Design a protein with these regions (language model features):
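Classical Sec-dependent N-terminal signal peptides that target proteins to the secretory pathway
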Residues: 1-30
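Residue-level hotspots at or immediately adjacent to binding/recognition sites across diverse folds
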Residues: 23-332
Length: 332
């Protein structure tokens, strides 16, 4: 998919200029962003605060962030706040069937059976919880200092410690296994959520690839993608089929003048668009970066002035959130 301009219809919703393509467009260039539905909102919050994660839940989007913020976001970009008396920063949120679990700093875990009323449950840790993933009705969370949390219902948790050098910053799962990553370039994998193998990417690929600081991992049924930065601050994106052999993707693209350039901006979030068979990165400086199956067809698009932190794709909608609790909505 790309944002290929076909025919545009302009209209106003709630004071926001929105653009809708008459057909289903494709993601190709920054200039063509307006071929998709686009709306952006900001809050009055400070520059350092914002949303940290977002999911699709019950026909709407649910985002979490600093100060315990939990907001529903509609496909038009309007938000509705969920009451939450706990002000810990929430780093991640996940749902399974009707239940919703949000987690974050100092080991906080909030549980909801309906997405409206959230109750604090005992996590058994005071470490920052950074990511969660469901598989086979088992919920696994990753936290600082090698802490793994495990739950069958989202309310009762047990923990174990992994001998890793870094903090577990992200976890994802498919039908086969969980994979997590640390901010020291380590990759952890488990088939049952209890027993984990640990690999040090930086050590194994020393001399072949630059050392990496990992940020997010995303699993689909046949691909695994890790995003982060190299030690020199340049962006890094790794692909694997089974998690055993990793290939770094070249992040080159053609700018609006047709000049070949390389992405220099840090990626923070990732989603998969199955209809377009593309991974889309949410990056600093309001940039989206598309990684289609064609490795020479990457696309750079700037949609905001804010650093983007999280992104999710649901049907025709791409919702991106970031600093200052900004919301960007794109309709393909």
């Amino acid at each position: 998919m790309s944002f290929l301009l076909t025919r545009i219809v302009n209209f106003i919703i709630g004071g926001l200029m929105c653009l809708v393509s008459a057909g289903r467009p494709f993601f190709t260039s920054a200039e063509d962003l307006h071929s998709g539905y686009y709306a952006q909102q900001k809050s009055e919050a400070g520059n350092t605060k914002g949303y940290r994660d977002i999911i699709f839940y019950n026909g709407k989007f649910l985002a979490v962030g600093n100060d315990g913020k939990i907001d529903y976001i509609s496909s038009s970009g309007e938000r509705a706040q969920v009451n939450n008396s706990y002000k810990n920063t929430l780093n991640c949120i996940i749902s399974s069937y009707q239940i919703v679990v949000a987690a974050g700093d100092n080991g906080i875990i909030l549980f909801s059976s309906d997405g409206q009323i959230f109750t604090k449950v005992e996590s058994g840790t005071d470490k920052n919880i950074n990511g969660m993933a469901f598989r086979n009705d088992l919920l696994v969370a990753g936290a600082d200092k090698g802490t793994i949390l495990i739950s069958k219902n989202g309310e009762t948790w047990s923990s174990k410690h992994l001998e890793v050098k870094g903090n577990i910053v992200s976890i994802s799962a498919n039908d086969s296994y969980w994979i997590g990553i640390t901010d020291r370039g380590e990759i952890i994998r488990s088939y049952d959520g209890l027993n984990w193998e640990i690999k040090d990417y930086n050590k194994e690929y020393s001399g072949y690839s630059k050392s990496c600081i990992f940020k997010k991992v995303l699993l689909t049924e046949n691909r695994i993608v890790i995003i982060g930065t190299h030690d020199d601050g340049s962006p890094a994106v790794l692909f694997s089929t089974l998690g055993n052999v990793w290939t770094e993707r070249l992040l080159i693209y053609h700018d609006d003048q047709g000049i070949i350039r390389s992405l220099t901006i840090k990626p923070n979030g990732i989603t998969y668009d199955p209809a377009g068979d593309q991974f889309i990165l949410a990056c600093d400086n309001g940039v989206l970066f598309s990684l289609p199956s064609c490795t020479k067809c990457n696309v750079f698009s700037k949609i905001s002035t804010n650093n983007l932190s999280a992104i999710t794709c649901a049907g025709d909608y791409l919702i991106v959130v970031g600093e200052e609790f900004s919301i960007s909505v794109v309709r393909f």
